[in-house]
Amino acid sequence: MLVQVICGRRDAAEAADSLQELERLADTAGIEVAGQLTQRRPRPDGATLLGAGKLADLRTACEDRGANHVLFDNELNAVQAYNLTKALERRVFDRTEAILQIFARRARSSEAQTQVELAQLEFLLSRIPVLEAQQRFKGGIGMRGPGESHLQLRNAPMRRRIADLRQRLAAIQARQRRSRAKRPWPVVSLVGYTNAGKSTLLNALAGADAYVDDRLFATLDTKTRLVRLGEGRQILLTDTVGFIRHLPHGLVASFRSTLDVACQADLLLVVVDASHPRVQDHVDVCRATLDEIGAGGVPSLLVLNKCDLPAAAETATHAAERHPLAIPVSAHSGLGLDTLRLAVAEELKR
């Protein structure tokens, strides 16, 4: 069951889009959605987020539909997660944990696996009492990947492991920065909202075959390809993990070495899906995340991808009006790619 509590004056359309995104996260995590439940409240209940009546409705709905998991769009603190687990007698988790689950499944390189393990352990450190309660209920998806073997650890050993992982990632980041300092070509980094088509754009510009999947967070590891802009100019184009609303701060911190490529780039291509009805929200999320990782000052171009889709006819027009320098493209059909190459070349001359 998917659950969302809408508090205060939160925009209804934005909340609906967030819930739809949560459903896609569930699908990516391999969870079948049995139904949805929403509640609007002036403020969240400190103990269970939901009101008592709605909590009873949720338990009944889970029983009627055979739902073994309850996924909240809202971030749950440890107390709320513990109380909800006891009240519902089911596996309860939130958007943050769902994203961690997806990252654990998608991590391939040693660096990505180390970053996922760090994020998992920092999350588990705050949830040990909740996990003990949840272990009494069967059918949970649980934490998978490197963090799983640490469920029984307690604070001191876990903190030592976290410190070790941070040190390891700091060494990776330092090594990567030294390597980038020797690069023979300018580096342009593809950043943007998850599932905006960054990997497809990388393939289209570089004539490459990077992995592409119509699911959230298909890319965790940084991929770099050589791209020819014309007139003898070449760049290194990188593609890295996508952004999403409410991306956990701990996850951003854990993936610092991967996201550092954006901070060190000569130019950023901020890619969003022009066919999405709330494309401006995605632009705002991207800008905020870039600020958070320290890349807000890097020169950038806004790229409106998927402009060939029928749904983009109106949304892309509005986005272009708000961002007159944005470049509409279609990585799938090739529309606008020559214009994008020229824009990149001109920007790098400055």
Pin down the residues of each PLM region:
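N-terminal accessory targeting/assembly segments
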Residues: 1-95, 99-100
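Conserved G1/Walker A P-loop phosphate-binding module
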Residues: 131, 135-252, 259-263, 267
